[in-house]
């Protein structure tokens, strides 16, 4: 079967990804974001999970050309999206379509005088409802019920300390009504996003063109996180002669993503897990202010090699994780109607993507703590290149009551990936970050 999504349904979503706008609009298609930070990638399952170990991603076709993903496209540049979910996709694209096909058609020029269009928006977002977690009294009560011997004299104690000062909490009831640390409110923040789109299109019977520019920016819900995307496209359709025409497109995309992330380091060190498991009170040892300022919760420190609880606020501030990606692509197709019913088409595409990822862990991060409380960082650079050439000869003819459609095709493609990783540990100080990597 084939499911279609129109431009109107995609443009209405002010997001930095076409995949995010596509979510929930096609029955039987599951789209999940790999991480909670803005600009994170998406996993899409069109026909369920067809493999336990291999890649289950669908085949992406944009304006007739195969691409690795559609992250570079702007929502405002989409004309339509079709998702092929059954065996019909394999009949067209072969084994590559085993996991389904996502076919995208972008906007092209139309006959008429030049039309300049602009649309922009600003959005404000915040968490409408936080999780209802334990307050200090409920938390202390639970700890004493679970392990009273371990937490004896940790949260309350009768009498005075060595300096003759009465203990702040003499009994469990002293915690009733005490305001604790709300880690959710301290870590999460309201966010703003902006989306701007400018396009020019027009043409005549022989030449049609479109030029578009898009800019999207979003702040993350965590401090020191966010995403911005700049994309542009120029497309021209030219009828050279009565029987010859060509279609050329140039695409550009630049994305910048930053943030510590939410799903990395699974288990108890997951960022969201750290927020939900952090103590609302420091007990007798720490005030709320001291608990907020502690990079590592001393009570939850298990040994010199391991730790159970880090400060999620300081984690977002002490981790620098940025990724920059720049993509260029060019597509060209030439169609020649040799005789009536017999058409030859040759098409080529070239795509190159350069990425640079910088990660630096300052003092106060759990990663630096694991490294003997010394900062460390890494830089990774990558380059992906793909080019493809298609050649098709098609014969369509209707003879009496019979219709014939015969196609002879040939394709050659090339893809390469190069990566370079540099890593250093035991930085004497963290002021320079990865600039001191050498």
What are these regions (language model features)?
Residues 1-234, 238-247, 251-253, 262, ...:
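Short, small/polar-rich motifs associated with maturation and membrane association
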Residues 26, 339, 429:
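Acidic-histidine catalytic/liganding microenvironments
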Residues 110-179, 190, 220-225, 231, ...:
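Surface-exposed loop/interface segments of Gram-negative outer-membrane beta-barrel transport/assembly proteins
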């Amino acid at each position: 079967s084939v499911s279609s999504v129109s431009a109107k349904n995609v443009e209405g979503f002010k997001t930095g990804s076409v995949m995010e706008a596509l979510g929930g609009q096609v029955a039987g298609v599951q789209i999940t974001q790999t991480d909670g930070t803005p600009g994170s990638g998406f996993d899409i399952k069109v026909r369920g999970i067809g493999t336990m170990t291999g890649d289950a991603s669908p085949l992406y076709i944009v304006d007739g050309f195969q691409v690795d993903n559609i992250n570079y496209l702007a929502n405002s540049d989409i004309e339509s999206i079709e998702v092929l979910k059954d065996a019909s996709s394999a009949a067209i694209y072969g084994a590559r379509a085993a996991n389904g096909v996502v076919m995208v058609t972008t906007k092209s020029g139309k006959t008429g005088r030049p039309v300049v269009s602009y649309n922009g928006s600003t959005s404000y977002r915040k968490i409408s409802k936080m999780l209802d977690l334990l307050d200090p009294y409920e938390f202390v009560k639970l700890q004493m019920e679970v392990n009273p011997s371990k937490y004896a004299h940790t949260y309350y104690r009768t009498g005075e300390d060595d300096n003759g000062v009465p203990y702040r909490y003499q009994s469990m009831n002293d915690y009733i009504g005490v305001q604790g640390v709300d880690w959710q409110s301290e870590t999460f923040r309201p966010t703003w996003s902006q989306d701007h789109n400018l396009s020019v299109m027009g043409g005549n019977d022989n030449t049609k063109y479109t030029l578009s520019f898009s800019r999207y920016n979003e702040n993350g819900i965590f401090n020191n996180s966010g995403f911005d995307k700049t994309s542009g496209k120029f497309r021209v359709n030219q009828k050279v002669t009565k029987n010859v025409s060509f279609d050329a497109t140039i695409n550009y995309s630049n994305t910048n993503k930053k943030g510590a992330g939410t799903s990395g380091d699974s288990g108890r060190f997951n960022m969201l897990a750290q927020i939900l498991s952090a103590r609302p009170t420091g007990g007798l040892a720490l005030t709320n202010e001291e608990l907020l300022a502690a990079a590592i919760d001393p009570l939850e420190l298990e040994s010199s090699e391991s730790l159970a609880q880090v400060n999620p606020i300081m984690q977002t501030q002490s981790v620098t994780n940025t990724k920059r990606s720049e993509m260029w692509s060019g597509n060209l197709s030439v169609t020649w109607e040799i005789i009536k019913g017999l058409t030859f088409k040759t098409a080529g595409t070239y795509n190159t993507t350069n990425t640079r990822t910088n990660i630096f862990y300052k003092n106060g991060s759990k990663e630096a703590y694991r490294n003997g409380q010394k900062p460390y960082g890494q830089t990774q650079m990558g380059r992906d290149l793909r080019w493809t050439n298609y050649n098709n000869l098609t014969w369509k003819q209707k003879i009496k009551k019979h219709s014939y459609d015969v196609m002879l095709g040939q394709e050659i493609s090339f893809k390469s990936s190069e990566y370079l990783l540099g890593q250093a540990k035991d930085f004497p100080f963290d002021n320079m970050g990865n600039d001191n990597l050498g």
